[in-house]
């Protein structure tokens, strides 16, 4: 525009100059000369030089380029895209160029939708962080299905670094179980229980759930065996009675038997004990269980410095602290090193002394031993002290067992103490050696292969699963468990009260095998128990 206005001005200026300088007569000649000079000049070059700036200025001055329809452009038509998509003539064209354009548009639309979704999720995650704090916001975002932010937008790295955990588990663990500094920085609510989050942390100590761990750490024996043994009968899935001397038991312990080492703990199976005594309606047994549960956290429960290295003589001195060590050693030698038989002999000696006229007032060691037997059969030891006169003591209301002797029992029932008494698990078959258990000829016919001494039965039950089942021997009637090695009901003073007879009374009725020349021979007199 300016160029067109400038180009005609050159001859006009020449004519004006000519008219001003030259005479009016020669004006036509001067105009012709000026036109010839202008024609002889390189006008094309001057025009190109003069046209370039107006073109650039025109591009800068105009509005930005509007989007055009690609389909129309493929077919040689230029049309603005605004409001044109519906009315395009080639909107349904299937040529190669239009198909390529349609595919490109579909890919671009998918990318735009993905970026829009990611931006929305990041905004939601930031809102949750502002509301609940960093760690809880991430947890809620994961719970709601919101994708966590990408590493380029990671804002949790500093929190995870302070907590010392990974990005996956460190953030939830740091929210509830982390350091106090991180909790002070983050204003958050307790949306997750702290115990569960502490359990996920590897450095968090897990307290025992009410049960003290055994010294060897294998406390899973009574937990796994007691619930399975409880529903069955005592004669089918009881503990093996193979107390064939302490060397064999020690060898089995060194071989890695976890059940004998862990089942003898005083608190190892206390939670299972009410289930073993309550189904047959023993009130005194449940009361004794409650007393033992209260007296469970005693110093005797903690494992000694070397419970596995305790000798049979040490076991006897723990069970009978009132006896001299030399006397207990002689009794152990007379029994051939069998700890259970030695304990039976000492108990028979005390039982004989009670029958001779000592009465219910038992000395301190007798009370301790009675507490030891009562731990296997709760509330049934008083029958031995009663001597068969009148009703047995378990029928009287109220607990009569001295609970203050339980620490001694807990010390005596440590895994090391009972580890040498039992070398079988709760699922091993019973020992078919009847003479080894001292079953007499008057036992049941089926009890010959399963002849069990009551005290041995009690200690076997305590060694197997710490009074988990105890074979239900104190509660058995004549028709309930006929395979146990007890005398028929007519030998007892109260045949109609067979459910309440105790192991001590059953052991006092029939004579145990004696050892001639020993200090503690068979001194049991069966007449006080007879009517």
Curated annotation (Swiss-Prot):
Residues 197-312 are annotated as: Disordered. SMART domains: DM. Expressed in adult brain and testis, as well as in embryonic ovary, kidney, heart, lung, stomach and brain. The keyword Zinc applies. Belongs to the DMRT family. One of its GO terms (cellular component) is nucleus. Residues 69-116 bind DNA. May be involved in sexual development. Keywords: DNA-binding, Metal-binding, Nucleus, Zinc. Pfam families: DM (PF00751), DMA (PF03474), DMRT5_DMB (PF20624). GO terms for biological process: cerebral cortex regionalization; dopaminergic neuron differentiation; neuroblast proliferation; neuron fate specification; positive regulation of neuroblast proliferation; regulation of DNA-templated transcription; skeletal muscle cell differentiation; stem cell differentiation. PANTHER family: DOUBLESEX AND MAB-3 RELATED TRANSCRIPTION FACTOR DMRT, DOUBLESEX- AND MAB-3-RELATED TRANSCRIPTION FACTOR A2. It is found in: Nucleus. One of its GO terms (molecular function) is identical protein binding. Disulfide bonds: none annotated. It comes from Mus musculus (Mouse). Residues 274-285 have a biased composition (Low complexity). This is Doublesex- and mab-3-related transcription factor A2. Residues 310-345 form the DMA domain.
């Amino acid at each position: 525009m300016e160029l067109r206005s400038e180009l005609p001005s050159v001859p006009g200026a020449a004519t004006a100059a000519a008219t001003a300088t030259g005479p009016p007569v020669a004006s036509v000649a001067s105009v012709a000369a000026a036109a010839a000079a202008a024609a002889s000049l390189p006008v094309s070059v001057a025009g190109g030089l003069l046209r370039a700036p107006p073109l650039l200025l025109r591009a800068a001055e105009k509005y930005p380029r509007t989007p055009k329809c690609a389909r129309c452009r493929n077919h040689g038509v230029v049309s603005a895209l605004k409001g044109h998509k519906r009315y395009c003539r080639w909107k349904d064209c299937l040529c190669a160029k239009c198909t390529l354009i349609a595919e490109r548009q579909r890919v671009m639309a998918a990318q735009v939708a993905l970026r829009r979704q990611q931006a929305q999720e990041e905004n939601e995650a930031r809102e949750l962080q502002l509301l609940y704090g960093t760690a809880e916001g991430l947890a809620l975002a994961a719970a709601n299905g919101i994708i966590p932010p990408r590493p380029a937008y990671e804002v949790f790295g500093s929190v995870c670094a302070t907590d010392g955990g990974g990005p996956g588990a460190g953030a939830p663990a740091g929210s509830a179980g982390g350091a106090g500094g991180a909790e002070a920085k983050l204003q958050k609510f307790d949306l997750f229980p702290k115990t569960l989050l502490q359990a996920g942390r590897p450095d968090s100590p897990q307290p025992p759930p009410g049960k003290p761990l055994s010294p060897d750490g294998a406390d899973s024996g009574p937990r796994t065996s007691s619930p399975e043994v409880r529903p069955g009968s005592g004669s089918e899935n009881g503990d093996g009675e193979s107390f064939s001397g302490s060397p064999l038991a020690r060898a089995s312990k060194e071989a890695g038997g976890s059940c004998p080492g862990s089942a003898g703990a005083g608190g190892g199976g206390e939670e299972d004990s009410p289930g073993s005594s309550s189904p047959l309606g023993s009130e005194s047994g449940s009361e004794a269980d409650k007393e033992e549960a209260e007296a469970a956290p005693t110093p005797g429960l903690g494992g000694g410095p070397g419970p596995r290295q305790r000798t049979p003589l040490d076991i006897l001195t723990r069970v009978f602290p009132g006896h001299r060590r030399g006397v207990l050693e002689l009794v152990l030698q007379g029994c051939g090193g069998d700890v259970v038989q030695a304990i039976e002999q000492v108990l028979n000696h005390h039982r004989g002394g009670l029958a001779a006229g000592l009465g219910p007032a038992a000395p301190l060691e007798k009370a301790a031993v009675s507490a030891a037997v009562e731990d296997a059969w709760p509330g049934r030891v008083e029958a031995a002290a009663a001597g068969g006169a009148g009703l047995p003591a378990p029928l009287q209301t109220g607990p009569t067992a001295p609970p203050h002797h339980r620490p001694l029992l807990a010390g005596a029932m440590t895994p090391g103490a009972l580890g040498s008494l039992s070398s079988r698990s709760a699922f091993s078959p019973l020992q078919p050696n009847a003479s080894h258990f001292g079953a007499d000829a008057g036992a049941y016919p089926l009890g010959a292969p399963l002849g069990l001494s009551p005290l041995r039965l009690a200690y076997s039950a305590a060694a197997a699963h710490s009074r988990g089942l105890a074979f239900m021997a104190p509660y058995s009637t004549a028709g309930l468990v006929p395979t146990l090695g007890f005398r028929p009901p007519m030998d007892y003073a109260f045949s109609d009260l067979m459910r309440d007879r105790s192991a001590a009374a059953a052991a006092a009725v029939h004579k145990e095998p004696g050892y001639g020349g020993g200090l503690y021979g068979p001194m049991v007199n069966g007449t006080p128990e007879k009517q």
